[in-house]
UniProtKB/Swiss-Prot annotation:
Protein name: Capsid protein
Localization annotation: Virion
Organism annotation: Cryptosporidium parvum virus 1 (strain KSU-1)
Function: The capsid protein self-assembles to form an icosahedral capsid with a T=2 symmetry made of 120 subunits.
Keywords, sorted A to Z: Capsid protein, T=1 icosahedral capsid protein, Virion
Organism placement in taxonomy: Viruses, Riboviria, Orthornavirae, Pisuviricota, Duplopiviricetes
Chief localization: virion
One Gene Ontology CC term in the entry: T=1 icosahedral viral capsid
Length: 319
């Protein structure tokens, strides 16, 4: 159980305390909810939930945004956290509790938030100068997102290895996931978001108790859209529409504390212990990225082979 919480320090800013009793009670409710629903594969301890909650609070403060949740999932071994979120059973209670208790101002918990940034009207150098290339098209993307009824926030590409941006609609019970947000050069693809529309995802359980949601869910259409097509596909009546935006950092290309430091140079975080830089080999996204890197290395080695062949041909011509 958590016995202390080190406040987040920002240059020229006050401390933002967290009510430990609130965190403990919420994590207990979430753990009990998972067990009560009989989800044997969803075995996550209360300590792990507390870690997720506190991490979300820390990063939510850095991003200055109340509608996006950042989750660091190394406390959930051998499990892809996005699959947990995409369980049609677990999403409503788990996500609603988090969004209700963490991502909006709370009068009872002692958590204070910085006002939301108006991304469309004023630049924020301390956050946006290092975000490339989203910052170049920030107004355009923000306007598109606002028409769709949700908001966007920039991501620092150098700090992550794999990112998925997922929106959950309470109205239609759909998950809208944008994968492949970064390329091998650690740059965000500003206009190349791949669209995955998931209808009522179901969860299967194998012998090891792991979620097989990724293999059983139904994906409709997979295509890159320009802004106009993007708006036409997803435009729906915005009245009474509730959409949750969620950023899931699966694994990092830098240590945990170093990544947090990258988010804002004016923020300093306590040293996090027991965080390995090497993610589990069972992660599917990591394996696919290793395959891509390996294939690129093969392609880069081809010119050397061509040079060798050319040399041999020159030798043959000399005879």
């Amino acid at each position: 159980m958590i016995t202390s919480f080190e406040s987040i320090e920002k240059k020229n800013a006050v401390y933002y305390p967290v009510d430990l009793k609130f965190v403990t009670d919420l994590s207990s409710d979430l753990s009990n909810t998972a067990d009560g629903l009989g989800q044997a594969w969803y075995k996550i301890s209360q300590v792990a939930v507390e870690h997720i909650i506190l991490t979300a609070l820390k990063i939510n403060y850095v991003l200055n945004h109340r509608t996006l949740l950042l989750i660091y999932n190394k406390k959930v071994p051998d499990m892809d956290l996005i699959n947990i979120i995409q369980s049609s059973i677990m999403v409503p209670r788990f996500v609603r509790d988090l969004i209700r208790e963490i991502l909006r101002p709370m009068h009872h918990s002692g958590i204070t938030y910085i006002p939301d940034l108006d991304l469309s009207t004023r630049p924020t150098p301390h956050l946006l100068d290092t975000f490339y290339p989203i910052a170049e098209h920030l107004t355009r993307w923000n306007n598109v997102c606002q028409k769709l009824g949700f908001e966007m926030v920039p991501i620092l590409p150098e700090a992550v290895q794999s990112v998925s941006l997922t929106f959950y609609s309470y109205e239609t019970d759909e998950l809208l996931s944008f994968d492949n947000l970064i390329n091998l050069d650690w740059r965000i693809e500003a206009f190349g978001w791949t669209k995955h529309l998931v209808h009522n995802p179901t969860s299967e359980v194998d012998e090891l108790g792991k979620s097989q949601t990724a293999t059983s869910r139904k994906r409709v259409q997979e295509k890159d859209y320009e802004c106009d097509d993007f708006r036409k596909v997803y435009e729906r009546p915005l009245q009474n529409r509730r959409i949750l935006g969620m950023i899931v950092y699966r694994y990092t290309c830098a240590p945990y504390t170093m990544r947090l430091g990258h988010l804002s140079p004016n923020c300093r975080f306590p040293t996090e212990k027991n965080h390995s830089e090497t993610p589990p080999t069972s992660n599917r996204v990591l394996l696919s990225e290793q395959t891509m890197v390996h294939s690129i290395q093969k392609n880069r080695s081809k010119p050397k082979k061509v040079k060798i062949v050319t040399t041999e041909c020159s030798a043959d011509r000399s005879h």
